[in-house]
């Protein structure tokens, strides 16, 4: 079955999840360093408030944190981390599939281009995607999405012995006592 967005769906642009656990808070859309400046520039030129936090960092020595950031994350505009700030939820215009329009669709991050293909072992389709929920089978036309994921993986490959993950401190009010902020060494 060929992958296509489900009619009227924008779920992947709205709902963010805790990853890898609630402790780390909700994750934003993965942004590579070379994408960060373009996204910040677009937001500034269109008077959009965005929050970009670090996501993955590396170091060659065990220290208090990373020396280089290899990935960032674009956080949602709601206090709980949900809803991409580039998702136009106020316009009456809709995308070809009937969902909300993306203000940066032509220049969206590789992570958005890769979706619903996600990094797992083995690479899979995101089970939370409405298309994947309803079809339950592997889509046959996800070559472009797979290529985007491969580009991300290639750009994040490192020989650094220490990899750090950033806890966003962002999540639902009901989880606020469990969520932390700051860098954590991956073990």
Label each residue range with its predicted role:
Residues 1-187:
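Short loop/turn segments that flank or connect secondary-structure elements
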């Amino acid at each position: 079955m060929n992958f296509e967005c489900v009619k009227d769906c924008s779920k992947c642009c709205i709902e963010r999840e805790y990853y890898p656990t609630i402790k780390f808070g909700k994750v934003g859309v993965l942004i590579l360093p070379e994408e960060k400046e373009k996204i910040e520039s677009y937001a500034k030129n269109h008077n959009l408030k965005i929050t970009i936090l670090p996501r993955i960092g590396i170091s060659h020595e065990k220290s208090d944190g990373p020396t280089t950031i290899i990935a960032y994350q674009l956080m949602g505009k709601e206090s709980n981390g949900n809803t991409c700030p580039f998702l136009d939820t106020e316009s009456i215009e809709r995308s070809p599939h009937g969902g909300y329009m993306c203000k940066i669709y032509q220049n969206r991050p590789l992570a958005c281009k890769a979706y619903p293909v996600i990094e797992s072992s083995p690479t899979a389709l995101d089970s939370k995607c409405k298309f994947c929920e309803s079809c339950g089978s592997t889509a046959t036309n996800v070559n472009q999405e797979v290529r985007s994921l491969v580009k991300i993986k290639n750009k994040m490959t490192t020989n650094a012995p220490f990899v750090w993950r950033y806890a966003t401190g962002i999540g639902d009010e009901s989880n606020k006592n469990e969520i932390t902020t700051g860098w954590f060494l991956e073990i």
